[in-house]
Amino acid sequence: MRDRTHELRQGDNISDDEDEVRVALVVHSGAARLSSPDDEFFQKVQTIRQTMAKLESKVRELEKQQVTILATPLPEESMKQGLQNLREEIKQLGREVRAQLKAIEPQKEEADENYNSVNTRMKKTQHGVLSQQFVELINKCNSMQSEYREKNVERIRRQLKITNAGMVSDEELEQMLDSGQSEVFVSNILKDTQVTRQALNEISARHSEIQQLERSIRELHEIFTFLATEVEMQGEMINRIEKNILSSADYVERGQEHVKIALENQKKARKKKVMIAICVSVTVLILAVIIGITITVG
């Protein structure tokens, strides 16, 4: 899922409805608030953000542990178990976020009845933005694990080439990996190859890791597809809202510049008035003196 945040289209006309949403939406430090916020709704939004922050942290930790295990020829069982526990935590957090997003999703009846309500449209926007962020995070995790799987397969392939001069083709390797059972996988290798015990142990360990990975990827994919279609449908609306938010910031900045210019012009006008008043006063004084002298002489 591509990041839409940096692909805002230029030149779109901003409708009156979107102006209302733009005015109502204030983005600050990752939070969004209505001018008259629904406390319960935004408490749920805050909870979702916190859960997603935990999920993102776990995904980063998973990436680090995968790198460590890939660099270890024969990782200890505790390392593999720790990695699997981390995957389970990620799946659990993913399910929690999915349920939380479902809880704040505006019901169709409510959305239809209050379509013109800024509050309703604000909730739909919040749900859409959070859903998009969640899908992108899950997609990143899935891609990361798929890449990790390929690296494990490559390790097995290298071991087989070293011990068997490449007698096992890539197609045969994939078929053995798809057997679903480590015992079958190992026995298939032993039939036609002379593999050292250490190499066999590593191959078996990598195959077991691949099996766990594939289960995790399938389960995460189910979470991913749950929201992906909806996010794709809402993407256009989110793009417009984001564009309007950025436009609002631009409007504010330009407004501040205009105010500054107006204040400077006001100061200049005030100075001109003072100078004119002084000139008029001096002129009146001179005229008064001239008239006074004329009367005295006469």
UniProtKB/Swiss-Prot annotation:
Main location: membrane
Membrane topology designation: Single-pass type IV membrane protein
Transmembrane segments annotated in the record for this chain: 275-295
Segments on the Cytoplasmic side according to the record's topology features: 1-274
Domain t-SNARE coiled-coil homology: 200-262
In-chain residues carrying the UniProt-annotated modification Phosphoserine: S15, S29, S35, S36, S117, S208, S248
Subcellular location: Cell membrane; Cell projection, Neuron projection; Cell projection, Stereocilium
SMART domains assigned: SynN (SM00503), t_SNARE (SM00397)
Tissue: Expressed in all tissues tested including adipose, brain, testis, intestine, liver, heart, spleen, skeletal muscle and kidney.
Keywords recorded for this protein, A-Z: Cell membrane, Cell projection, Coiled coil, Hearing, Membrane, Neurotransmitter transport, Phosphoprotein, Transmembrane, Transmembrane helix, Transport
Site (Required for neurite tip localization): I290
UniProt superkingdom: Eukaryota
Coiled-coil annotated spans: 38-163
PROSITE patterns: SYNTAXIN, T_SNARE
Free-text function comment from the UniProt entry: Plasma membrane t-SNARE that mediates docking of transport vesicles. Necessary for the translocation of SLC2A4 from intracellular vesicles to the plasma membrane. In neurons, recruited at neurite tips to membrane domains rich in the phospholipid 1-oleoyl-2-palmitoyl-PC (OPPC) which promotes neurite tip surface expression of the dopamine transporter SLC6A3/DAT by facilitating fusion of SLC6A3-containing transport vesicles with the plasma membrane.
Identification of the protein by name: Syntaxin-4
Protein species of origin: Rattus norvegicus
Taxonomic placement: Eukaryota, Metazoa, Chordata, Craniata, Vertebrata
Name of the gene: Stx4
